[in-house]
Amino acid sequence: KNSDIAFIAVGTPMGDDGSADLQYVLAVAKSIGQSMQKRLIVVDKSTVPIGTADKVKATIQKELDERCSDLKFDVVSNPEFLKEGAAIADFMKPDRVVIGTDSDYAKEKMKQLYHPFCMISDRFISMDIRSAEMTKYAANAMLATKISFMNEIANICEKLGADANQVRIGIGSDQRIGYSFIYPGAGYGGSCFPKDVKALTKIAKENGYTAKLITAVEEVNDAQKLVIAQKIVTRFGEDLTGYTFGIWGLAFKPGTDDMREAPAIYVIKELVSRGAKIKAYDPKASSEAEQHYLQGV
């Protein structure tokens, strides 16, 4: 009630149609409108579709109107770019802070808030609200694109007898490309990339545009999750009864216990469906996988 700044940092789970579910964001906005006692800056940290700030503003204003209150407030988009497994380090030393606001008052307050963590001025990036909301989706879609692109290159290399790792070194040494997110593998997973890529394609479609490249990124990733299983089938045959395979690493990312959309789930289920037995281990995620994602496997 006495805060100058209130953060909305809740989940936006993916709906059945691929869209982001805003019920938790708007529930918090409603609560803020019911309880605020003075001018407030409302900061949306959640990954939300473009235009969500307008819905948050309308929700808060409705509650204030019902209270017959003329309190002022500003809605700010401040997408988070924390990496799972390194959240504290990323928060303490962010590589950039993106602020979306049309209010000079809110912009200055946010600068003051982040100054101890972001003393280099060019790391504080201010823009309009919709652009800030889009920036989060664009960043995740770009990283997902790099992953799918490199997996495509690796698959082509295998057909041609080229070494994908050597190709990775060759292209990564180009400063315009760099080495981040160009390691061939079993595809991306986790709570962000799959959800955000789907949401962005849906947002585009709802606004009359077909995002062909981003759609292809998702299609490539879906196929890549089964590449390892397909290699095993090619080597051992369609029926894997009597075979036991060891899986080292289960989470979508090392050092975490996050099994959401982890490629290992798809590989294991495909092998088991063909009669194989699995012995799997992950120093962080074994318990999570067994309890919630691989029951009965």
Segments the model singles out, each with a brief description of its role:
Residues K1-V297:
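Structural/interface elements that position substrates and couple domains in central-metabolism enzymes
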